[in-house]
Amino acid sequence: MGNIFGRWPGARKAIEDLHNTSSEPVGQASQDLQNKGGLTTNTLGTSADVLEYSADHTEEEVGFPVRPAVPMRPMTEKLAIDLSWFLKEKGGLDGLFFSPKRAAILDTWMYNTQGVFPDWQNYTPGPGIRYPLCRGWLFKLVPVDPPEDDEKNILLHPACSHGTTDPDGETLIWRFDSSLARRHIARERYPEYFK
């Protein structure tokens, strides 16, 4: 990992002291990779989906010029925390309207630069605040009031084209919440997802 996300030794040490347990992978491919050391026959569809996902997203305008420089791996708690703080410091996601396309861009970037399976960015169901299922990911989805329907917002505001894809009809934004590093709220509220 090195200096990819920068150094913040005090915060990192405090977080590591709080979490001496390893995180559990969320997706089936990540679970098989951690438990069995590779993809098994029951995840062949998943690995094909990963390859198809990568092929679909590298041909778009948002594509990336390189294939993964590291072996494929599941998202770990440390990597998720480092990525969250990196995106917060660089002004990445905090306050942006959530859309599946933006989430796919982030998944594709992580797949191509870090070799992380694109199954890590999942959230609890709505309505209301959606908490990340991946331990260490410090961005939750918070519902906001949709902007006013004046001509300027219809033409320019990203919520008009991205906020309508939520099954509950809510407009969601990413919010950074450092308390998610200390407490896994998704596991507390939805233990059935972690059996």
From Swiss-Prot:
Chain positions covered by the region annotation Acidic? 59-61
The superkingdom of the source organism is: Viruses
GO CC terms:
extracellular region; host cell perinuclear region of cytoplasm; host cell plasma membrane; membrane; virion component
List the membrane topology term(s).
Answer: Lipid-anchor
| Region N-terminal: start-end pairs | 2-53
Query: Which residue stretches belong to region SH3-binding?
Result: 65-74, 65-74
Annotated segments matching region Necessary for MHC-I internalization: 7-22
Q: Which InterPro entries match?
A: HIV-1_Nef_core_sf, HIV_Nef
Q: Where is this motif: Di-leucine internalization motif?
A: 155-156
UniProt-annotated stretches for the region Binding to ATP6V1H: 144-171
The short sequence motif called PxxP sits at 68-71
Domain comment in the entry? The N-terminal domain is composed of the N-myristoyl glycine and of a cluster of positively charged amino acids. It is required for inner plasma membrane targeting of Nef and virion incorporation, and thereby for infectivity. This domain is also involved in binding to p53.
The entry describes its oligomerization and partners as:
Homodimer.
According to UniProt, the name of this protein is: Protein Nef
- The organism is Simian immunodeficiency virus (isolate TAN1)
Which lineage ranks, top first, belong to the organism behind this chain?
Answer: Viruses, Riboviria, Pararnavirae, Artverviricota, Revtraviricetes
